[in-house]
A protein has these predicted regions:
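Conserved beta-ketoacyl condensing-enzyme motif
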Residues: 1, 97-111
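A glycine- and small-aliphatic-rich helix-loop capping segment at beta-alpha/alpha-beta transitions
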Residues: 1-12, 73-77, 114-126, 210-212
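Conserved beta-strand-centric core segments of catalytic alpha/beta enzyme folds
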Residues: 1-44, 146-212
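Glycine-rich beta-alpha junction loops
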Residues: 6, 34, 43-44, 58-64, ...
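Condensing-enzyme catalytic core mediating Claisen C-C bond formation in acyl metabolism
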Residues: 13-92, 99-100
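Beta-strand segments within the central parallel beta-sheet cores of soluble alpha/beta enzyme folds
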Residues: 51-59, 95-103, 130-136, 164-172
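Short glycine/threonine-rich loop-to-helix capping motif typified by GTGT followed
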Residues: 66-78, 106-123, 142-149, 179-182
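Stable alpha-helical structural segments in soluble proteins, enriched in small hydrophobic residues
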Residues: 81-92, 118, 122, 154, ...
Length: 212
């Protein structure tokens, strides 16, 4: 199915096939994995002395139904999902230098450029101040598991104050010109982490997590 959609990378280099935000990208790489999170209200978690990794302060969910595989070119719907998550959590007051975004970042020619546009629509001139990375550069695209595992990556980034990189980013595309944490993890004292999932058919979801 994905091969017939021309969505998969045709690279013969297994360690350099997943290339989010790189001008050499030609499709995503399939991955495998699983992740489980427990979402619990604050009062019961505190009462039972649960380990709380972060507070989920907002979410956004939109669907543009633009095309079965092609994302909406103007990024209106995908940007609105991020805005919804930010607005619900009153997160626009957080300085952009304290924000990390785990991008959907599939490494397909179209997705990465349009997701970059979505970030610019939401954050405007501050878009270049965010930390952004695609962990799919390391894990591949785990399909149904991708969102859960990338949310976990956000939680660990908040806890450890270490941001995962976008590996293989050697020739950054001019259409993906934000700071994408290239190649090496970095230390950053972030307050907010956003997890983006932008699926086929125009299904867009964003989660906003705040450090506690």
């Amino acid at each position: 199915g994905f091969a017939n959609c021309n969505a998969l990378s045709l690279s013969t280099e297994p360690l350099e096939s997943s290339l989010p935000f790189d001008r050499r990208r030609d499709g995503f790489v399939m991955g495998e994995g699983a992740g489980v999170l427990v979402l619990e209200n604050w009062e019961t978690a505190v009462t039972r002395k649960a380990t709380i990794y972060a507070e989920m302060i907002g979410y956004g969910n939109t669907c543009d139904a633009y095309h079965v595989t092609f994302p909406q070119p103007d990024a209106v719907s995908s940007s609105r999902a991020v805005e919804q998550a930010m607005e619900e959590g009153d997160a626009f007051k957080i300085p952009p230098e304290q924000v990390y975004m785990n991008a959907h970042g599939t490494g397909t020619p179209v997705n990465d450029a349009i997701e970059t546009l979505a970030v610019k629509r939401v954050f405007g001139r501050n878009a270049h101040k965010l930390y952004i990375s695609s962990t799919k550069s390391m894990t591949g695209h785990m399909l149904g598991a991708a969102g859960a595992i990338e949310a976990i990556a956000c939680l660990m980034a908040l806890q450890e104050k270490i941001l995962p990189p976008t590996i293989n980013l050697q020739e950054q595309d001019e259409a993906c010109d934000l700071f994408c944490v290239p190649n090496q993890a970095i230390a950053a004292d972030i307050t907010l982490a956003i997890s983006n999932s932008l699926g086929f058919g125009g299904h867009n979801a964003s989660l906003a997590f705040r450090r506690i």
